[in-house]
Each structure stands twice: as C-alpha cells, then as structure tokens.
Regions:
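Short, surface-exposed "cap/lid" segments of acyl-processing enzymes
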Residues: 2-83, 102-105, 132-141
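Extended, polar/charged low-complexity intrinsically disordered and coiled-coil segments in eukaryotic
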Residues: 2-39, 145-148, 152-153, 183-367
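Intrinsically disordered, low-complexity regulatory regions enriched in Ser/Pro/Gly/Thr
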Residues: 35-40, 53-58, 66-71, 94, ...
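Serine-dependent carboxylesterase/thioesterase catalytic core
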Residues: 48, 77-82, 90-221, 230, ...
C-alpha cells in the first residue's frame, strides 16, 4: 500500500508521522496527532556520520515516532552536513551542542534527552554532551528560608535528564591500528601509510580518527575525551546517562572495525552464533559490561593482542562506565558488504534488512 502523504501549513504528514525542516536545515520528526505531540517530553537527538545528512536517519526517526508517538520528539541533526563533517570532531561537537540548546529552547516542554548516533556521529555526540553537561551541585535557593537545607540540583545535559546514549558502528577507539579500518586488510604498512595521509582526504576529522592530532601540545582529542578535560565534562556526561549502548558489526563493515565500535580489546571479542531470534535475526550477541574500576584491577598487558598503549588507555577510560554491547551480523545478507549503512538503515529501499536493529534500539529504549 502506498504511503499516505499530506502537507499542512507547518509540516509534511506521512502515515501519521509529522516532519519539518528547521531553519538550520535539520529535520524534526514527531507524531501527526496533536495530543500525542503535545505530551512528548523526551528529546531524541539523532546524529549522522561523516559526509552524511539528516536524511540518513529518516527511517529510524520515523520508527521512533510511530512506535512512541506520545513519548518522543525526534531531532535529526544537520548542523554538520556533508563536507562540514571534515572540520574535526571538536568543531562538529560544538556545533551539535549549540544546535541541541536551540531545540531545547524552542520546545519548553522537554524533560529528558537521549542520543542515537551513527559512525563518527557517535564521537561528535560524545564531545557535545561534554559541553552540554551541567554538574550535580547543591546550592542555596532564594526561595528557601535562612538556615534551611540547600536545594539539590541534579546533573543534566542541557538542563534535561539524560536517559539513553546509543552509538551505531562508531569508532570509539579511533581508526588506527590493527584491523580498525577493515578495508586496509590489517596490513601494518597500509595502516601506517593511511595514518600519514588520511588528513589529505578527511582533513582534521581524519587526524582525530587516526590519533595524529597535536593541538598545541595537547594529547590526541580521543584521549582527552576519556576523562573530564578542562571545562569539558566528557566522562561525567557519559556517566550521567542511565544507559550507554554500542551496536557493532562483527564483520563486513569495511569502514569501522568490530573492536573499535564495541570498545573491546582483541582478546575480549566474543564468539558468536547465528541468531535464533526471529524478531532480531541480525543480533548475534549481547553483553552487559559493568563499570571497570581502574584502581582495583591489574593493568592490562598491551601488545600481544594488537592493542597498543594509546588504544589501551581509550579502552580503559571508556570502561569506567557500564556499557550494553550489542553485536550485529549481516554475513548472510546480499548487502553484507554495505553493513556500515545497513545497520543504520541509511536508505530503507536499499538497507531494509537492518530494520530489526532499529527495532531492537526502540524496544530497549528507556523512556
């Protein structure tokens, strides 16, 4: 059956889902039912990857609103469209943070916030929440009587309660090193050369991904992002979310490797079998990892499993918070070589086999 589409004064409505383009070029998606839309208090920010656009999350956004019409208001970011994604993770993160604050200002009824990000967009979102984080504090309220208890202020992201932080095929450990970028075939010479020349193609973002950036003598940005650094509360922000989830392709993703997207060492990659779940046929492994206490655990020896010292610092730093790790396989799909796009359902007509991954994200979403 063909989709029913109509255009109102402020938006296009298709099968009960309303969407409109904002001044910044981003796309907002919400329920076409006014009563549902008015009660939605949970902002879901969807962030695309390198050289992408807001339309990359069109299917995912529409599914969120179709299934949770009275709960979520979805904003598909496009402040970092196309070639702007080459400006660096930090520059993109600042733009995204400003964009999110604008959305919050325009929607005063919002109370909660979540992020769903694909590929490099996951790093951009991690940077943005570091900027948007407001620490937990106790402060005197002008409305309280003298000598009364201090008012407690919870930590927040842009003034909203942080709920879900979800990344899909994101290179959390960067792109350098053994098999982190699969199309380099794990050949050390290829990987070394790529690190030297990647900035010619992917500019500043390439330097960040290959950990070759040197901003005035500072450590590489991805290393800075595994701790609170200056006025940027990277790890405090990440830890403030009730859930942190990584979805990773176990194979056939020739852009982002399994290890870097799942925040694991080589020795920690699990053995997996074909899924027996008819609802989620491409989800092959699920793992809930508790926060890792660095002070109470022995340091991991590097080198034997392809993990270098800097990568080990990233794994250890990010493991200081708990993670849900969801492993995905499209090895039987006719489009398995496009796994990096299929896992996101970047284009429904081409990548619809990944729809069960989107369904899994929504079914486990904390409202």
């Amino acid at each position: 059956m063909a989709a029913e589409t109509r255009v109102t004064e402020n938006c296009a409505v298709e099968n009960g889902v309303c969407s409109s383009e904002s001044v910044s070029g981003a796309e907002d998606v919400w329920s076409g039912n006014l009563s549902d839309a008015s009660s939605a208090d949970h902002l879901v920010v969807m962030v695309h990857g390198i050289l992408g656009s807001s339309s990359d999350w069109k299917f995912g956004a529409e599914q969120f609103v179709r299934i949770l019409p009275d709960k979520v208001f979805v904003h598909c970011s496009e402040r970092n469209m196309a070639k702007l994604t080459l400006d660096g993770v930090d520059v993109m993160g600042e733009r995204l943070a400003a964009e999110v604050l604008e959305v919050i200002k325009q929607k005063p009824g919002l109370r909660k916030i979540s992020f769903v990000a694909h590929s490099v967009g996951g790093l951009v979102a991690r940077y943005a929440i570091g900027r948007l984080f407001r620490p937990h504090r106790r402060e005197k309220s002008e409305d309280l009587l003298p000598n009364s208890c201090e008012e407690e202020s919870k930590s927040s992201i842009g003034g909203l309660e942080p709920m879900n932080f979800i990344t899909v095929a994101t290179p959390h450990l960067g792109s350098r090193g053994n098999k982190q970028v699969p199309f380099l075939f794990g050949v050390p010479v290829f990987e070394k050369v790529a690190g030297l020349f990647v900035h010619w193609i992917f500019k500043k973002t390439g330097r960040h991904l290959f950990l070759t950036d040197d901003d005035g003598g500072k450590p590489p940005l991805l290393k800075r992002m595994v701790e609170d650094y200056g006025e940027l509360y990277f790890m405090s922000a990440l830890g403030s979310f009730k859930r942190r989830v990584v979805y990773s392709n176990v194979g056939y993703d020739h852009i982002v490797g399994w290890r870097t997207s799942s925040i694991r060492r080589n020795s920690e990659l699990p053995k997996w079998d074909d899924s027996l779940n008819e609802k989620y046929p491409h989800i092959v492994y699920e793992e809930h990892c508790k926060a890792y206490d660095v002070e109470q655990n022995e340091p991991t020896v590097t080198g034997d499993d392809g993990t270098d010292e800097l990568e080990e610092e990233l794994v250890t730093g990010l493991s200081r918070v708990s993670w849900e790790k969801i492993d995905v396989s499209f090895h039987s799909s006719r489009l398995r070589f496009a796994a990096h796009s299929v896992i996101q359902v970047k284009d429904y007509y081409m990548h619809s086999e990944g729809a069960d991954v989107i369904q899994h994200i929504i079914d486990h979403f904390l409202i």
